[in-house]
A protein has these predicted regions:
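Alpha-helix C-terminal capping segments
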Residues: 5-10, 113-115, 120-125, 146-151
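Alpha-helix boundary/capping residues
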Residues: 8, 110-113, 169-173
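ABC transporter nucleotide-binding domain
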Residues: 58-142
Length: 175
């Protein structure tokens, strides 16, 4: 336990009630890790932390899961944390599971497309999973395994981030 307090730089002579929200999160994590669990279930564990401490916590998580008998299940709105350490991602929106996939498979499944609204109306929609309109442009997800030959100088296709995939699927019209 003391090892985790020191590693997470938790002040040991400050009453818990006087600690910052970030230090309270870290002390809860230290208590959980000190019990040598096989499974950590965490809710928004990195949300109250500054970027430097968040990075330290993520490194600690990576060390924890190097032992293949151990796992972490955590919810997060910080998708960059998921990109750094997740093996599997489950996206739940408004109580519905939208997907549950291996992170690498998820990132290889789609292309993110961006074009003008007028151009989108003329595109073949085969392979387009979802889209949303944003001012004068349309942002869409293209299932890369199906593809549809969407290549045009007026259409930008790029590798999406997890956040972009989630945004289009949550905000967009599903085809």
């Amino acid at each position: 336990y003391i090892q985790y307090l020191e590693r997470l730089r938790i002040p040991q002579k400050v009453a818990i009630k006087d600690m910052s929200k970030g230090n309270k999160v870290k002390i809860n994590l230290a208590v959980a890790l000190a019990h040598n669990p096989r499974l950590l279930i965490l809710d928004e564990i990195t949300g109250a932390l500054d970027p430097i401490m968040r990075d330290e916590i993520l490194k600690l998580f990576l060390e924890f899961i190097q032992d293949e008998t151990k796992s972490i299940l955590f919810s997060s709105h910080i998708t960059s944390d998921l990109e750094k350490i997740a093996d599997y991602i489950t996206f739940i929106n408004k109580g519905n599971m939208i997907f549950c996939k291996e992170k690498d498979d998820l990132l290889c499944t789609y292309k993110l497309g961006i074009c003008r609204d007028s151009k989108f109306g003329k595109l073949d929609k085969q392979g387009i999973v979802a889209y949303y309109k944003d001012e004068s442009r349309v942002v869409f997800l293209l299932d890369d395994s199906i593809g549809n030959g969407v290549e045009h100088k007026e259409v930008i296709l790029e590798e999406p981030t997890i956040e972009e995939i989630m945004l289009v699927l949550a905000k967009g019209v599903i085809l």
